[in-house]
């Protein structure tokens, strides 16, 4: 199978995660998209709710959208979530599948700071969600790698790993930080969250502390 992977804290999961993942799936004709909550993200100090609660929210989204599956491989760890470690484990467990890791251009730019970042290209393709008109700075540390591995959505990959596939994604004006801020102030961001997530947050009195 051809499987997309979208990782994140999902604190909380919102349409800014869901809609781009669906777009990537459709444009690349992927079989599935796995939503993969982090446990202890290396680039973030902590999350606002427990790992178990974030897993429950992601599972609610997977129950609503047949295209998604919950991947809890990182959430089960007691150590920081490094992508290369996760991908090695997934490749061992699913040797016949191709993985397409989905990230924003901001994450791609910072990729050279990630743990064993070059090894990531031996384990998956990288799908980069782009904003219209955005161009990668030639002075960026990732620029040479980007130019070397770049391919397009209308080219069928002849290899199972190692490509960078840019996809223009419809802008989503949602931010987890802003959503948490609204919830703390008693505002329900109905346009940003699926109804099941809103009900879960209200039932469990989540995000009652400042974001």
Curated annotation (Swiss-Prot):
Pathway: Cofactor biosynthesis; NAD(+) biosynthesis; deamido-NAD(+) from nicotinate D-ribonucleotide: step 1/1. Transmembrane segments: none annotated. It comes from the Bacteria. GO terms for molecular function: ATP binding; nicotinate-nucleotide adenylyltransferase activity. It holds the Pfam family CTP_transf_like. InterPro entries: Cyt_trans-like, NadD/NMNAT, Rossmann-like_a/b/a_fold. Keywords: ATP-binding, NAD, Nucleotide-binding, Nucleotidyltransferase, Pyridine nucleotide biosynthesis, Transferase. Its EC number is 2.7.7.18. One of its GO terms (biological process) is NAD biosynthetic process. It catalyses: nicotinate beta-D-ribonucleotide + ATP + H(+) = deamido-NAD(+) + diphosphate. Catalyzes the reversible adenylation of nicotinate mononucleotide (NaMN) to nicotinic acid adenine dinucleotide (NaAD). Belongs to the NadD family. HAMAP family: NaMN_adenylyltr. This is Probable nicotinate-nucleotide adenylyltransferase. It comes from Shewanella sediminis (strain HAW-EB3). The gene is nadD.
């Amino acid at each position: 199978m051809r499987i997309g992977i979208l990782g994140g804290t999902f604190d909380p999961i919102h349409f800014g995660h869901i809609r781009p993942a669906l777009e990537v799936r459709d444009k690349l004709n992927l079989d599935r998209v796995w939503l993969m909550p982090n446990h202890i993200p290396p680039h973030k100090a902590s999350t606002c709710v427990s790992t178990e609660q974030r897993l429950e929210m992601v599972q609610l989204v997977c129950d609503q959208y047949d295209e998604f599956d919950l991947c809890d491989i990182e959430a089960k760890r007691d150590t920081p979530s490094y992508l290369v470690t996760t991908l090695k484990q997934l490749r061992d467990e699913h040797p016949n599948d191709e993985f397409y890791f989905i990230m924003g251009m901001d994450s791609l730019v910072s990729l050279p700071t990630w743990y064993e970042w070059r090894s990531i290209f031996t384990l998956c393709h990288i799908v980069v969600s782009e904003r219209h008109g955005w161009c990668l700075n030639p002075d960026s540390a990732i620029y040479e790698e980007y130019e070397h591995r770049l391919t397009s959505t209308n080219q069928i990959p002849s290899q199972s790993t190692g490509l960078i596939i840019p996809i223009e994604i419809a802008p989503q004006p949602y931010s987890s930080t802003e959503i948490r801020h609204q919830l703390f102030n008693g505002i329900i961001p109905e346009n940003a969250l699926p109804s099941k997530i809103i009900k879960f947050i209200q039932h469990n009195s989540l995000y009652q502390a400042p974001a």
